[in-house]
Amino acid sequence: MANSPQAKKRIRRNDRRAEVNTARMSRIRSFVKKVETAVAEGDKKAAEAALKEAQPEMARGVARGVIHKNTAARKFSRLTKRVASL
C-alpha cells in the first residue's frame, strides 16, 4: 500500500494514464479493423481509404508511446500488402 504522498499521486496518475492509453489502443484497433473488414469484403477503394486513415492513427500511437514503432511498422506493412493484393 502506498504511504507517501508521492506514491499516492503516482497511483492516481498511473490510473489516469492507463485509461487514456486504453482508449488510444482501442481507437487504433478500430481503425485497423476497418481496413481488415474492407479487405475481407474485397472492396479495394474502401480498404485504401481506411488504410489512409489508419496509418496516422498508428503513427500517433507510436508518438504517444502506446505502441512500439516496429509493431506499428509491421502492422502497416502487412495491411498495405493485403490491400495491394486486392
Swiss-Prot record:
This is Small ribosomal subunit protein bS20. Binds directly to 16S ribosomal RNA. The keyword Hydrolase does not apply. It comes from the Bacteria. GO terms for molecular function: small ribosomal subunit rRNA binding; structural constituent of ribosome. SUPFAM superfamilies: Ribosomal protein S20. Keywords: Ribonucleoprotein, Ribosomal protein, RNA-binding, rRNA-binding. GO terms for biological process: translation. It comes from Erythrobacter litoralis (strain HTCC2594). One of its GO terms (cellular component) is small ribosomal subunit. Belongs to the bacterial ribosomal protein bS20 family. InterPro entries: Ribosomal_bS20 (IPR002583), Ribosomal_bS20_sf (IPR036510). The lineage of its organism: Bacteria, Pseudomonadati, Pseudomonadota, Alphaproteobacteria, Sphingomonadales. Disulfide bonds: none annotated.
